[in-house]
Design a protein with these regions (language model features):
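Non-catalytic interface/linker regions that flank or bridge core catalytic/transmembrane domains
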Residues: 1-244
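Broad gene-expression machinery/nucleic-acid interaction feature
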Residues: 38, 275, 415
Length: 421
């Protein structure tokens, strides 16, 4: 293996990952081909044999054995040498492995895949740094206080009390990865409570970076930084959603929702509340309780730590409690029935809350996938929002007529008529 062969290997891995997706997040992943799967373990061994860098491969055997056990059970269940872990086969595979249920199976698979993928990222990071040192030591370009860009990565040059979120925001906004070394520096970072305004604003910039958020978030998550910032995240990390609508685990879905919400920030008066609401809208999942109600309870201490006002916390609780309202109402109720519009009016206090809820509904639907968010469903939601806006402005739903006792008596005898003019 020469250097050019390693470059070929990297390109091959990137192409395969693009085709098969992430083993850690997909609900029906390919155990062998997906990112974080068995072929990535073989690639890590090949990199190690090359000798260009040293990789800790001791724990790879345990990870590989765990994935091979899953694959062996899968082949036994499906009677074929197919490596895609289909939804309808997961319960049987879990039973064969003597696990509690398919949720435990998929959570274990996700955790293993994330570890493999992280080790792969570390390996390529070491390789790229070695190549840089073998030629010349570049100087970092300063982009913010104690933050620079070196070799197309954002790096932390020195530690200060709030540097972690500032570095995450800068990486997300620049569309660059945050270096693995920098992520590891932040493992024990703690902000004062409530968070300073600078940290809160950088959090919004971080999660508002669109598609760039994905790899920065994952690098921080693998280093343990995300759970240090948000301990509540651990309950949904790698948590599977075993239904035909969702594509991703709960945590990955919430990150994807924030990514989709970033494209909608210009449609709302408070982009910060939209982004934070999107990132935590399913934080209540993982128990038998109503996840919307539980999530509304969990967001309160999170938002207090972040430093939001009482009014903003109330808005975030509203968004999480009612994040399914518009989609469920639009698809299950008659939009021509005034009672349908009144149902929304009774729960949504004003136009500002409605626009935030509408944007969150769109982001949630797009992040879930086409099976859950079709053009038809989007049109229904848009129509419901349009009618509700008109009602809020007093142009659609008239107040319910109040009848006198005499009129009620006539109505009971079918003798009451009303003429509108």
């Amino acid at each position: 293996w020469k250097r050019d062969r390693l470059e070929e290997l990297r390109l091959s891995m990137q192409s395969r990952h693009q085709r098969f997706g992430d083993l850690a997040y997909l609900l029906e992943p390919d155990i062998k081909e997906a990112r974080g799967g068995l072929r990535d373990i073989n690639a890590l061994r090949a990199i190690n044999r090359n000798g260009a860098i040293q990789i800790e491969v001791e724990n790879l055997e345990e990870l590989e054995r765990s994935l091979l056990d899953v694959r062996d059970s899968l082949h036994k269940v499906n009677g074929r040498n197919k490596d895609q872990l289909l939804f309808q086969e997961q319960d049987k595979v879990a039973a064969d492995l003597k696990l509690i249920d398919a949720d435990e199976l998929m959570s274990q698979v996700s955790s293993i895949a994330r570890t493999i993928d992280y080790q792969s990222n570390v390996a390529w990071h070491k390789y790229d740094n070695r190549r840089t040192f073998s030629f010349r030591r570049n100087k970092a370009t300063s982009v913010d206080r104690n933050i620079g860009v070196l070799n197309h990565e954002v790096i932390i040059e020195s530690i200060d009390p709030n540097v972690g979120m500032r570095a995450a925001a800068k990486a997300s906004q620049l569309g660059l990865p945050l270096s693995i070394d920098s992520c590891q520096m932040l493992r024990n970072e703690n902000f004062s409570t409530p968070w300073p305004r600078e940290v809160r604003e950088n959090l919004v910039a971080f999660i508002g970076g669109g598609r760039a958020l994905e790899r920065v978030w994952e690098a921080l998550d693998q280093a343990g930084v995300i759970e240090n910032w948000f301990p509540e995240w651990g309950a949904v990390r790698s948590l599977p959603q075993r239904n035909a609508l969702h594509r991703h685990t709960v945590d990955r879905h919430m990150v994807e929702t924030a990514i989709c919400a970033a494209a909608l920030t210009r449609t709302v008066h408070r982009p910060d509340l939209l982004l934070v609401g999107a990132l935590f809208h399913d934080i209540g999942k993982g128990t038998q309780e109503d996840h919307s109600e539980r999530g509304a309870e969990l967001i309160e201490p999170i938002a207090k730590r972040i430093g939001f006002s009482i009014e903003d916390i109330a808005t975030l609780k509203f968004l999480i409690r009612h994040h399914l309202l518009l989609a469920s109402t639009a698809t299950r109720r008659d939009l021509d029935d005034p009672a349908t519009i009144q149902l929304v009016l009774d729960l949504v206090p004003d136009l500002q809350h409605l626009e935030l809820l509408h944007a969150l509904t769109i982001a949630d639907g797009e992040a879930t996938g086409k099976a859950a968010w079709s053009d038809w469903k989007a049109r229904l939601v848009n129509d419901l929002v349009r009618r509700t806006k008109s009602a809020m402005k007093g142009t659609l739903v008239a107040p319910e007529m109040q009848l006198t006792e005499a009129q009620i008596e006539l109505a009971s005898q079918n003798r009451l008529s009303v003429t509108l003019s």
